[in-house]
Swiss-Prot record:
One of the primary rRNA binding proteins, it binds directly to 16S rRNA where it nucleates assembly of the head domain of the 30S subunit. Is located at the subunit interface close to the decoding center, probably blocks exit of the E-site tRNA. Belongs to the universal ribosomal protein uS7 family. The lineage of its organism: Bacteria, Bacillati, Bacillota, Bacilli, Bacillales. InterPro entries: Ribosomal_uS7, Ribosomal_uS7_bac/org-type, Ribosomal_uS7_CS, Ribosomal_uS7_dom, Ribosomal_uS7_dom_sf. NCBIfam families: rpsG_bact. The keyword Translocase does not apply. GO terms for molecular function: rRNA binding; structural constituent of ribosome; tRNA binding. Part of the 30S ribosomal subunit. Contacts proteins S9 and S11. GO terms for cellular component: small ribosomal subunit. This is Small ribosomal subunit protein uS7.
Amino acid sequence: MPRRGPVAKRDVLPDPIYNSKLVTRLINKIMIDGKKSKAQKILYTAFDIIRERTGKDPMEVFEQALKNVMPVLEVRARRVGGANYQVPVEVRPDRRVSLGLRWLVQYARLRNEKTMEERLANEIMDAANNTGAAVKKREDTHKMAEANKAFAHYRW
């Protein structure tokens, strides 16, 4: 931990088109090697694809997808008397959003569509419909927490 106390959190600016901080955070997650304009192009094209295919506002679809992907519980390793226990803990709200965005981008990258725009659009639409790899990741995380419920009293 730093000697000068905790580092102040930087506030992200809302993006120019959708005026949303969530969209900016998603752009930052998509970005590789500091190429932000490329990441913006990917996301905005993906949103156009979503608008085209669903006929709905892409922001609504994205927010629904994020809601379906954000985990409520996760497990953390805790060492007790020489044994490592997977202790279920509640996920902080800011970490929930971060994990949700990270999983959306991570599993979009693993898809088989030709362009990243299509992959991201399809992963967001799947997540909004409660299907897709990112939602499965959340379910697996919750299952792990449920399976290790017995160690919940080791919470810190």
